[in-house]
Amino acid sequence: MYIRKVHIENFKKFKGAFDLELNSDLNIIVGDNEAGKSTIIEAIFLALTGIFRNRYIRNDLNSYIFNKDVVDEYLTNVNAGHKANLPKVLIELFFDGEDAPPIFRGLHNSESSDSSGVSLAIEFDERFKEEYEVLIRGKEVQSLPIEYYEVKWYGFNWDNATSRLIPLKVALIDSDNGKLPNGSDIYISRIIKDNLDSDDVVKITQAFRGLQDDFSGNQSVKDINDGIKGSSGITNKEIGISVDMSSRNAWESFLMTYLDNIPFTYIGKGEQAIIKTNLALGNKKASNAGVILMEEPENHLSHTKMNELISYIKHHCEDKDKQLIISTHSSFVANKLGLSRLILLNGTNTLRLSELKKDTEAYFESLPGYNTLRLILCKKAILVEGPSDELVVQRAYLDKNGKLPIEDGVDVISAYNLSFLRFLEIADKLKLAACVVTDNDGNVNALKDKYKDYLHSDHIRICYDETVNSSSIEIDDKAYNCNTLEPNLLNANSLDEICKVIGKEFNTNEDLLNYMKGHKTDCALAIFKSKEKINYPQYILDAIQ
């Protein structure tokens, strides 16, 4: 059994409805910061356990789990006297597989399909309708009235759901989880407890009670308590200090994990991440879990340590009938775990490489540099034909804005001419801001025909020189194409200016172009590093707007 689909409405990052189809085995969710990766992981865990950030959601409702835009729209409308529907959070998990249980099968889901699954809804409790009407008729509503909300957790057949009843178990691995007040790690403490059977827990509880007895029986503590009793005039009852044993599981809050006699929280973050992951995948609950969730396993890890961790993950989860859902923005993680399981995320837009044309999918699977992720992880991509174009565009951006494009989240990617359309296919499906900087090669009509599907796009721009340079120049007895980067740079500047920047002397344009043709990258690097500024062709200026 596995999760076939996740449906989310108005939860944190996602405004309105968001659907994500999942693979039955491995899913690698890739997106930039704030893309919604963590929201998906948290939504799945919440719907399966009723727990959000270490607390049961029924006991810790707050307005911040609602999408902020939805809440703001509600407040604007209700305070303007308009009809305002109270926001609602809904998370649905659709189960599938041969062993999908009939227990939660029904039609009460967003698909209205006969499916097995669970829903968790956070919505207005109609029992408070009168109180709510009084509230909105009074003073201005400043925040979502969360005190009138309730949590509903049910199967698609309307039966109430609990984590015990849901047959699909889940383990969440988050290497950046919080700490207990005593400094120990919540996450690793829970993992170790999960590995203890009931007899072990009894033994630890008894040992901890023995520590309390030893503490209370210590002569120094007795003397202190006698002093407190003698100086207190607050009550007739005896006052003293001791170890807190008010809870049957009081020992848990005092649990401190050690590694080679060093407190766990004092070892390196990378080592912590690996130990947490290994313990979590190997503990009893994870062994029985059908779904394993991992948030950004690359955090704090070096290249070598990341290799070790990925190897362990693959070994542990292969052929073990587990569904693994990993969020990451590391190209290394995605590449190692498998491009075919990649899910690209940009807001509410998702894309699998399998949804691309077959030749495009095959192309990206063979890419060693993994520029696919560079495209999705930037605010805007400028696609250029090669390294020399990349250097010149970066310098043009620096001259105009006083900083490199990457500092503004703009990535200049050498896509090479033949792969422009492949990158644009991804940008188009994900609604990514992208710009192509290309030569017209002396045939503007052919270029327009090539990019005809994107010439009127709202988020994709094709930048090129609309004028064909008909200059007749021969180099080595061959006609020279004057509609490329180097001639365009020369046209925007003088012979002397270009010579000064590249540190060479030439008497004719032909000699300069001949040199630049054979030393493209060297000349571009000289332009990039030069203290002198030059002029740039208009199509490059258009690209950096």
Where are these regions (language model features)?
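Switch/communication elements of ASCE P-loop NTPase nucleotide-binding domains
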Residues: M1-T49, A250-R374, E390-L391, K400, ...
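Conserved P-loop NTP-binding catalytic core
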Residues: A43-S112
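Conserved catalytic network of the ASCE P-loop NTPase/AAA+ motor domain
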Residues: H82-L86, S110-S113, L144, L281-S287, ...
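Short glycine-/polar-rich loops that comprise or flank the Walker A/P-loop
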Residues: P87-I91, S113-V118, I146-Y149, L168-V170, ...
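Electropositive, glycine-dotted interaction segments
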Residues: L90, G97-N218
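Conserved nucleotide-binding/hydrolysis micro-motifs of P-loop NTPases
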Residues: G97-D99, E123-F128, N157-W158, E298, ...
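Extended helical coiled-coil dimerization/tether regions that scaffold
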Residues: I192-I275, L279-V291
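Acidic, divalent-metal-binding catalytic cores of TOPRIM
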Residues: A334, S340-Q545
